[in-house]
Amino acid sequence: MIPQISQAPGVVQLVLNFLQELEQQGFTGDTATSYADRLTMSTDNSIYQLLPDAVVFPRSTADVALIARLAAQERYSSLIFTPRGGGTGTNGQALNQGIIVDMSRHMNRIIEINPEEGWVRVEAGVIKDQLNQYLKPFGYFFAPELSTSNRATLGGMINTDASGQGSLVYGKTSDHVLGVRAVLLGGDILDTQPLPVELAETLGKSNTTIGRIYNTVYQRCRQQRQLIIDNFPKLNRFLTGYDLRHVFNDEMTEFDLTRILTGSEGTLAFITEARLDITRLPKVRRLVNVKYDSFDSALRNAPFMVEARALSVETVDSKVLNLAREDIVWHSVSELITDVPDQEMLGLNIVEFAGDDEALIDERVNALCARLDELIASHQAGVIGWQVCRELAGVERIYAMRKKAVGLLGNAKGAAKPIPFAEDTCVPPEHLADYIAEFRALLDSHGLSYGMFGHVDAGVLHVRPALDMCDPQQEILMKQISDDVVALTAKYGGLLWGEHGKGFRAEYSPAFFGEELFAELRKVKAAFDPHNRLNPGKICPPEGLDAPMMKVDAVKRGTFDRQIPIAVRQQWRGAMECNGNGLCFNFDARSPMCPSMKITQNRIHSPKGRATLVREWLRLLADRGVDPLKLEQELPESGVSLRTLIARTRNSWHANKGEYDFSHEVKEAMSGCLACKACSTQCPIKIDVPEFRSRFLQLYHTRYLRPLRDHLVATVESYAPLMARAPKTFNFFINQPLVRKLSEKHIGMVDLPLLSVPSLQQQMVGHRSANMTLEQLESLNAEQKARTVLVVQDPFTSYYDAQVVADFVRLVEKLGFQPVLLPFSPNGKAQHIKGFLNRFAKTAKKTADFLNRMAKLGMPMVGVDPALVLCYRDEYKLALGEERGEFNVLLANEWLASALESQPVATVSGESWYFFGHCTEVTALPGAPAQWAAIFARFGAKLENVSVGCCGMAGTYGHEAKNHENSLGIYELSWHQAMQRLPRNRCLATGYSCRSQVKRVEGTGVRHPVQALLEIIK
């Protein structure tokens, strides 16, 4: 039995008083003080961990102003505040103690756009890709690019002055910020925009907080103009935080306070809104993917690409390329970046040309390719091949791979993981190759592996050395390397922070700015935040206050993780290896990961949040001397003793009375998971939440009783076959209003599915497919076996959507094969989802033995529901290991593609069909939609893939009363709109859950693709 974890870091009374008074004064946002909420805000995309006291989620600038006004009260003068955006920072920019002000949950409105003048006004929590999705119909985009664009907020981009691919042409975020609305500590609203210097000087004479800010910045930047110009490196990635260089324009006629706030990392004010310059979308985009025999060759050849008038040049090394090859993302780009025969591709330059004149762009591309051919022929520059990508969809797929490369590095095998701490250094591009050669020599001298990729056109390369932060000695080495890289960048006239901000690296600021200029930064900080209450420890302390700076060797995630025994860390790798990349925060409703995060906007309900909580849970167990591995081994095979039952009942009674246990917070996070498994493939680190969720639930329920619904779900494969013998009787009973009401109130289940009428057994009466014995199958000759297909049943389709199985049997017959309906054998997935892992292992072993016996017949076995078929491949393998055997159950599309391989493709005509894939299917097997389309094409039918996220049903998730609202909300995010615009009778869904959800919400259902094929085939 797991122990009660009754102690968690508490919240000081002053913070609780502040939050209470904040709500009393009309705050309309959310506040959070639970340990789980605070833990999810204690990390970002960096190696650091710092627990805040509380989190607030404002809904408007007025809410932020209320926070700032209340904070200025004398009784709260000791509290500190840190703004936070998407949490994608790689250096702890938004990590701090005190109160986190999260702008991402609610402040995500696009306020107005002026296409004629080319600007848009947004709230700070708008996500970069969200804005570009909005701008696309107007023919515009927000130009600064970054790899985390689908979850990074514009407020975060402004605060770190982010930039990435294309910065040589498009510049940094600050080059596109026309003005901001910021709230000062005290509640004053500061609106910035470029001003004539005379007006700025006049504003500085006002005896107000804003007046003093204008005066300080105006005077310091004017008086120290020459010092600033002399000390700021002449780089595309100029020195930010605070950008004294660009407050005045070159002619000294214009003054813009915005430049001080961009890159300020929340140390000066709360930026709540911004007016942004937007750029016309280029009409033509081309990529030339240039392949090299070494990474050094790729680096040294990059200036040549820039001279060819390319928009951007992105470089990727062999380590990143190889990790991409092992990831599901490679499926989308493999034809665009093919291998060169008899050559090893160890470096890649992704060269983009863009503009409005197609002839001009093609001329530049052709000229480059001709020159590349010359280099290949003469064996120069290490060029071994090239490919041109002319289609926009292909261009976007390659950049998606490049963006995912950041996270893929974290998926390197072993305890040492490539980590960010010196990952955005910038040097003049002409020195980059020599600089990187020295950088690599430094890392090689310590015997470290590393991955490299980046923006070679701008002199920025992302370098992530592999270190084990659970090893104290490697943590010390990280600081040593960091110090050495500071010296190395200085040697080449570069910067340690080229695009990701300073964060915990601010301790190096005096070395880059010089003491005299650093003193000027402190004066600026003092004008905005004299008492050092906004994100203290970052950028610089205010003048007149001897306050400490954050350090590179501050407390890290590894500091906590190393407290968990190594064996536990290894066995719970799924939770331990989350590196915080945050891809699970993807805003796009059409992205399958993560539906619970999308609907709740609560990061507890994301793979990263769940992994964070489980890591802390494991640490707290270790702190109490409890070994979860031993507990798992000691679990009884079946049943529980009376003493255990009494103990669980007592513990559950105390829990219902409000007795605290951190395990309850973890359980709440796990209960929100739909177990769709999108994270297990879409996450670059392959964080498999359903797997460690099941293990957690199994251990959690050693202490607490399971709800009745869990037992009903886990035994569905036992009672469904019995109920299917009299489906009308049971349906009549289930349909009674009183039964449904009692089910919702006492079991917690709603909208219970009805059994199929007629049942599958009734439909198959007299059909030869249902009456073949094993002996008859074994007696078939080779030719007969080659034409026989074994249909594997699953509990949901066979008993609740039997027509699909019956139609598949008929389809197999129609194609000239002999279908044989195998006896139903429980799959066990429902047991796995609910954490009945011992029971699941028994079910899996029994069914695996049966299917292995069938596999020996040498006939294909096929199932129609993706989630259940893929369970044989994934969960069975994890549960049984080698005992699983070698049996293989094919999906319907896999078998059809093979069976129809020799059939010619017919002329496509008529109305389209529309394919809605199951989350588990399209993420684990991304080629499935195309495979289905190819199958339909063989019969002259067009099948279009519909890009949607999760349907919200996910097995029994949508039937649980506590999930009902979220289930319907998830459906509304993408499925409902698609169903409304497409003809329902032409929509097809492979998942039983998906079809059930459509019928529940829309009133009429959709069919399985095999049913459409049965109709199509003449």
Swiss-Prot record:
Keyword Iron among record annotations: yes
One function term, GO molecular function aspect: metal ion binding
Subunit structure: Homotetramer.
UniProt note on regulation of activity: Activity is completely inhibited by the addition of 0.5 mM Mn(2+), Ni(2+), or Co(2+) and partially inhibited by 0.5 mM Zn(2+).
All residue ranges annotated as the FAD-binding PCMH-type domain in the record: 48-281
Cofactor(s), names only, from the UniProt record: [4Fe-4S] cluster; FAD
Gene designation per UniProt: ydiJ
Residue intervals passing through the bilayer: none
Classification via InterPro entries: 4Fe4S_Fe-S-bd, 4Fe4S_Fe_S_CS, FAD-bd_oxidored_4_C, FAD-bd_PCMH, FAD-bd_PCMH-like_sf, FAD-bd_PCMH_sub2, FAD-linked_Oxase-like_C, Oxid_FAD_bind_N
pH note: Optimum pH is 8.0.
Job of this protein: Catalyzes the oxidation of D-2-hydroxyglutarate (D-2-HGA) to 2-oxoglutarate. Appears to be the only D2HGDH in E.coli, providing the way to recycle D-2-HGA produced during L-serine synthesis by SerA, by converting it back to 2-oxoglutarate. The physiological molecule that functions as the primary electron acceptor during D-2-HGA oxidation by YdiJ in E.coli is unknown. Shows strict substrate specificity towards D-2-HGA, since it has no detectable activity on L-2-hydroxyglutarate, L-malate, D-malate, L-lactate, D-lactate, L-tartrate, D-tartrate, L-glycerate, D-glycerate, glutarate, or pyruvate.
Residue span(s) of domain 4Fe-4S ferredoxin-type: 662-695
Residues bound to (R)-2-hydroxyglutarate: R402, H500
Binding site for [4Fe-4S] cluster: C673, C676, C679, C683
One Pfam entry name: FAD-oxidase_C
Protein name (record): D-2-hydroxyglutarate dehydrogenase
